[in-house]
Structures are given as structure tokens and as C-alpha cells.
Amino acid sequence: MKQWALILGASSGIGAACAKKLAEAGFNIYGIYLRKPQSVIDGLEDYIKSQGVEVQFHKMNAMNEDKRLEAIDNLKKLGIIKCFIHSIAFGTLKPMLSKNDEPVLDSKNIEMTINVMGSSLVYWVQELHKSNLLVKGTQIFSMTSSGGRRQWPSYGAVSMAKAVLESASRQLAIELADGGIAVNAIQAGVTDTPALRKIPGNEEMIQYAIDNNPSGRLTTPEDIASYVALISQSNDSWMTGNVIRIDGGEDITG
């Protein structure tokens, strides 16, 4: 059967880099995206096709249950999932407490952020597993950050979501281990992506990372994609339930 990589958040940043690198490694690509213009998607599709693999990009809300089931039904007709990447970056950036009457997080903000960036991993894996699309050797990756353990201004809801994502990844790793399916969270170093640029104080974060990373630079989406592709080709599930830091040493010095 044909082997596919399913990528949520495939149109930019780490998701797009993973789509390209996995295509280079021979994976067919099924990308889910929400906002990028068609011209960007066309460019990605052209590059992926040039690697001699199949590609489908679908514009949809990954949290919409009907759309998710529609995607699963489509995937069942295509083959099996050997790599699943959860790389959704969409959350509310507000403080928890008000100073000078500034807007603060409310219950809808927190619930939405946790569901989109955290809990949705579980919902997708449940459907993939139920549909027998996950097989021995499948690699599942969730994209976390040091924000799951460290606090930044206005990052509270996203930080909560990352903690949920890591916990869900560990639990899924336990429940899928006997099937030879690995689940790991990837903690990238500070990476200059559209998602990072939305975080208040991002320029200070970038400069701090550059100044303190022993490798002397920021992490790039391609850094992450290279390791994701390498692991995805291994067919080995013994490394599972981890938070894998890919950051040039940033975390141990920061």
C-alpha cells in the first residue's frame, strides 16, 4: 500500500518544511491548512510533485469533526499513514490578569487554544487508529515548545495547550506501543516562523536565542524537518513518549 505523511498545519513554517523533506524521502503528502493563499499552496504542490510523489492539500478547519471524518474517509482510499505531524499554531495571546484595563483571557479563549493546539491531537489519532490507518512503524509527532515549561508575556493559554499536548503525546505513546507505533513531541528551539512573529516580545526572544544558543544561530524549520524525515524512515518505535529537543543546545544553556 502507498505510504502517506499526514500533516496538520502543512502550509508554512515547520509543517511546510516537513512536507518538502518527507517528499524528498519518498513519502506521499496529505496536507491540511487553513489560511495560506492558493499561490503558496500551488508552489508547495509543485515542489512536492517534482520529487516524484503524490500530494493532496486540503483547506479545512482541523477542529471541525465533519471535515476531519471526511479527510479520514479520503485517506482510507489512498493507503496508510506512516507519518502524522500535528503542527497547528493557532491560539489566543492575552495575559491572564488585567493591567490598565487590557483584555484578558476568558474561558472561550482558553478552551479554544487548548482544544486546537493540544486536544486535537487526540481526536485525530483516535480516528486514524479506528480506521486502521496507523501501522507498525508509524511515527506520530506533535510540535511543542519550551513554552510548555517556561512562561512568556501573554503566552499563558498557549503554554497550557503545550503542556496538554505533551501529556497527550505521552499517553498516546503508551496506548499505541504494543502496535509498534511511536509518539513523540518535538521541542524546537526558537524558530522564526509566522507563528512566532505573532507572540508579543518575539524580537527579544529571537535575539536572546541568538545570543545564548551555543550553535550561534536560531533553529530553522529545515532543522526540524530533517530529523522528522530521518526518524520517519526508520520503522522503529522504541523511541516513544519523549519530548525530543531539536535546538542546537538552546534549552540546556537558556
What do these predicted ranges mean?
Residues G26-D42:
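Conserved glycine-rich Rossmann-like NAD(P)H-binding loop of the short-chain dehydrogenase/reductase
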Residues N213-I224:
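A conserved structural motif in NAD(P)-dependent oxidoreductases
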Residues S11-S12:
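Conserved glycine-rich cofactor-binding loop
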